[in-house]
Amino acid sequence: MMPYRLLIDRAMKSQPIEIWGNCKKAKEMVYIKDFVRLVRNCVDSELEGGCYNVGNGWQVTLEEQIKGIIEVFSPKDKPSEVVYCPEKPDPLQNAFAVEKTFRELNWKPIYSYLDQLRDFKHEMETEPMAGLWGTKEDYKE
């Protein structure tokens, strides 16, 4: 099962969710909707080519990721508890220099991390891609 789906499943069941390592480690979370907009800008661009980093210019900490999952997926009357485990291995961290992408391709992301999670929840509920990703039942523990 995909790690995110495990975390989401725990949140939906109001089960505790562990944060391993340094909860302030952060990474960029580029949403596919923003990425598609960037590809469209590349196709429409009059530039002859180039190398561009894809990023959103802001990072989401591990703590923000977990709290976002809880906010969107946990029952409002019984949200999952966050359990901090600083002794466990740290997650990877990343950030990209994206100023050139923003400037030359006239692009900036418009979707937040919570937008991504809300859309993901909607797709889980409506299952438009069940044939490709499976159904809710495929992700039960």
Predicted region positions:
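Flexible, glycine-rich beta-alpha linker
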Residues: M1-P3
